[in-house]
C-alpha cells in the first residue's frame, strides 16, 4: 500500500514539473530587455490588445492581432512566419502570456513584455499613436 502511495506521489510530481516546463517555453522580459530585443530587425512585434487599445498607442512597428478574438490562433499562424522571433505585448502582461503560450504551442520562438504596455509607458519608452 505504501508503494502505491509513493508511486502516485512521484507520478503526480513529475506531471506537475513537466507541465510547468511546458508553460514557460517563452521568455518574459522587462521593458529594458524587451526594448533591446526588439532592436533586432528580424523580430516581429505583436500587440495582442484590442484594435481600440492599439489605436490609442502602441510600440513602434507593432502589428495588431487581438488575442481575445476567437480566430486569434488562425490569424496569427497565417500571418506570422515561424522562422522569426515574435515579441508579444498586451496592456498589463496577462493576455500576452496567453498569446505566448498559443504561439509556442504552434512552434514559434516567443518573447513577452512582462509588464505590458502599461509598464512600457511607465518606463518612459517610445510609443506611437
Q: What is each model feature region?
A:
Residues 2-5, 19-37, 43, 52-85, ...:
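Rhodanese-like catalytic fold shared by cysteine-dependent sulfurtransferases
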Residues 45-47:
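Structural scaffold elements adjacent to functional motifs in cytosolic proteins
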